[in-house]
Structures are given as structure tokens and as C-alpha cells.
Design a protein with these regions (language model features):
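Long, hydrophobic, well-ordered secondary-structure blocks that form the structural core
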Residues: 1-21
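C-terminal catalytic domain of Rieske-type non-heme iron oxygenases
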Residues: 21-24, 28-153
């Protein structure tokens, strides 16, 4: 660089960007300032949805929805984690899911909600090795603390 030839001790290791531990799953890369427990969360997801070819999923812009809301992030998470509003807000989803069989499971570091399909509605073909084999699952909704949401439907 012009006029930089007289600078001493640059670059040095302390000039580098910080590095953070990373882990990957199905082509997704995860990191955090002080990550803990992500392996357990990924293990939970692997047992439930690991049979899906997630690493081959492709973005479909036609299915993208963007909503700008003025709310605290905790209120948004609370809304995501409760299914009570589904019959009143999400008409299409309510026609697909059996609200009486909507399930919420807590695991270390996150929450999984499982939407069971009504009779005749689309659902996953779940393999025998899955803990959900035999269920007509239409959707898996994962929330990983503090703010990662993964939806599979």
C-alpha cells in the first residue's frame, strides 16, 4: 500500500479478527460467542429430522414471507412457541393441522413443536428409525435458544 512501507509490526496476530468455534450439520454452519449445548440440540434434530435431505434443500423465493413488526424479540419468540393463536390467525395451517394433537416438547437448549396432519392432509413419510414413525407429521418447528428457528413442512 502507498506510504505503508515504514509501518512496523503490522500485521500482527492481535490485528486478526477473532475466531469462534463452529460446528456444522446438514450443510448449515453454527457458531456463537460462547456456544454451549449445540451438539445436544443438533443430536435432537438429527434423531427427528435427520432423514430429510436438508443439505439438498434449495431456497424458493416464491414461498418467502417478510413481516416487519414492532415488538420485543421475546414477544416474537413467545408467539412462535405457543400454538393457541393458530385457529384464529393461520387459516390455511389450521385446516392442515389437527389442533387437538399439536405437540410441544422441551429439550436441553430448545423446544420442538410437532404439527400432526388432519386426515387426508399432506404429511411426511417418516422412516421406521424415527421416534415419530407412525405419526402423520405435517410440520416440525424448532426453536433453539436464543433465537434460531427452523421450520420443516
Amino acid at each position: 500500500m502507498p506510504e505503508f512501507d515504514l509501518v512496523e509490526g503490522f500485521p500482527a496476530a492481535e490485528d486478526d479478527l477473532r475466531t469462534f468455534p463452529t460446528t456444522s450439520w446438514k450443510g448449515l454452519i453454527f457458531t456463537g460467542l460462547q456456544p454451549s449445548g449445540m451438539e445436544a440440540c443438533l443430536g435432537e434434530m438429527e434423531s427427528r429430522v435427520g432423514w430429510m435431505p436438508i443439505e439438498k434443500f434449495e431456497y424458493d423465493n416464491s414461498r418467502n414471507r417478510c413481516y416487519e413488526i414492532r415488538a420485543n424479540w421475546a414477544l416474537y419468540v413467545d408467539n412462535y412457541l405457543e400454538g393457541f393463536h393458530i385457529p384464529f390467525v393461520h387459516n390455511d395451517l389450521n385446516r392442515t393441522l389437527d389442533y387437538d394433537d399439536y405437540r410441544t416438547e422441551i429439550f436441553d437448549g430448545g423446544v420442538l413443536q410437532i404439527g400432526i396432519a388432519r386426515d387426508g392432509e399432506p404429511s411426511f413419510e417418516i422412516p421406521e428409525e424415527s421416534p415419530d414413525f407412525g405419526l402423520e407429521v405435517a410440520a416440525y418447528y424448532y426453536w433453539i435458544y436464543p433465537g434460531l428457528m427452523l421450520n420443516f413442512y
